[in-house]
Design a protein with these regions (language model features):
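P-loop NTP-binding core
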Residues: 1-159
Length: 159
């Protein structure tokens, strides 16, 4: 992806991608995905570039931390709850060639938000029985999201 502008979005409350990218204390960051989604839920404007960290290797990151777990609970009672992440990313779409969303292995509201905001899903799966069962549920969820929320969503591949 040399020469392309890439934004990584950590949608995991454990902040695994954030930590892997070198931010070892995600709970100390002033602005994270949780902050931005809370703004979207409250109809507050999100400024261009707000909450985006710049990595030395040339990719940008919207980090996550444990606050995202509480936000996921709040999403349940929110209007348009499936599209909050899409609202956050709409302002960034023009600035990037690729936006990659890293999801936790769960089918909660954050994953639904990621599928609603995505053009395509690339699904990593371990070659194990329980992973295969989880894949079956995820594929059913993708079909529902495609029917009800995001008809453009496609499965790019399963690894």
């Amino acid at each position: 992806m040399e020469g392309k502008k890439v934004l990584l979005v950590d949608t995991d409350p454990q902040g695994s991608l954030t930590i892997s990218m070198g931010w070892q204390q995600p709970d100390e960051l002033s602005t994270t995905l949780s902050t931005l989604m809370q703004k979207a839920m409250n109809d507050q404007p999100i400024q261009p570039g707000e909450g985006i960290l710049h990595h030395a290797e040339g990719v940008d990151l919207i980090p996550a931390n444990i606050e995202l777990a509480g936000l996921e609970v709040a999403l349940v009672n929110s209007m348009n709850r499936e599209k909050m992440l899409k609202q956050v990313l709409d302002s960034a779409k023009r600035e990037y060639d690729f936006i990659l969303l890293d999801c936790m292995p769960s089918l909660g509201m954050l994953t639904i938000n990621a599928l609603a905001a995505a053009d395509a899903a690339l699904i990593p799966v371990q070659a194990q029985y329980l992973s295969a069962k989880g894949l079956e549920q995820l594929l059913q969820t993708v079909q529902k999201v495609r029917r009800q929320i995001n008809p453009k969503l496609k499965i790019e591949g399963i690894l």
